[in-house]
Amino acid sequence: MTHESDDPSLDWLEAELEDSLDEDFEIEFSEPMLSMEIRRIYKDQRPDLLDRQVYFRNLLRLQAELIKLQDWVQHTNSKVLIIMEGRDAAGKGGVIKRITQRLNPRIARVVALPAPSRREQSQWYFQRYVPYLPSGGEMVLFDRSWYNRAGVERVMGFATEDQVEQFFQDVPEFERMLVRSGIILLKYWFSITDEEQQLRFLMRVHDPMKQWKLSPMDLESRIRWEQYTKAKEQMFSRTNIPEAPWYIVEGNDKKRERLNCIEHLLSKIPYEDIPHEKVTLPDRRYNPDYERQVLPDELYVPKVY
């Protein structure tokens, strides 16, 4: 997919599709299906997208640094907690995937909790999150977090205004407690424009491989865009504390979004290179008395390819 079309909006769509090639599959997509929608949404506002070669070169460099960070976290028994928040379709999942892609899942893990159960709803609000906080030598990334109360729960009416106010009073001290306990806490908000969210939702509607990402809550969030904006602004004003400030990542270009977030994350943690002992691969030992057993054919996966 390297040709140039006469329609700039389709060039942008092609770049979006190529972005998925690094995920080990290609998406068959009907470009005419969305071309009119893209023209209508963007007109002359097509975003300036980062070149793919520049993107991958820098992504690999940053992922190598993330491995160094992982080694440092494990070696120093540090605790890192990264909160990822933002509008629906803002690219949080893509950023998280690029952060964890080459890391050890036993050290760097992702937490994405479902809606609270009836029992959890009766608990102290932060209680369901506490078991997932990092222990020594761990990095934890929250794909949405306790800030659901300030966002979706508030806008959709799942929490009362009294509960929201209690949250705003509690969360600064809760996060100060985490920092005092030795946790390195980073909070990111991923920001996209109204038009960009509309386009990404349309791609989810028309792309069978992305339809699972589209929920009734996503559709409702389009209707309540301004309510979410107001809730976000109050969340920033009430929870942006010196011990745990917010960092906003612009996300209209997903490639820049990923690189900028990872670059910033690395700059906020004082990690160092950890020396490793040289590894020498031992020779295989052969036992002259060993005979390999012949296994029945039904144990093998058929060679279709």
UniProtKB/Swiss-Prot annotation:
InterPro entries: P-loop_NTPase, Polyphosphate_phosphotransfera, PPK2-related, PPK2_PA0141. Shows little dependence on metals. The keyword Ligase does not apply. Its EC number is 2.7.4.-. It is an enzyme of class 2 (transferase). Has two pH optima at 8 and 10. Belongs to the polyphosphate kinase 2 (PPK2) family. Class I subfamily. PANTHER family: ADP-POLYPHOSPHATE PHOSPHOTRANSFERASE, POLYPHOSPHATE:AMP PHOSPHOTRANSFERASE-RELATED. NCBIfam families: PPK2_P_aer (TIGR03707). This is NDP-polyphosphate phosphotransferase 1. It comes from Ruegeria pomeroyi (strain ATCC 700808 / DSM 15171 / DSS-3) (Silicibacter pomeroyi). The lineage of its organism: Bacteria, Pseudomonadati, Pseudomonadota, Alphaproteobacteria, Rhodobacterales.
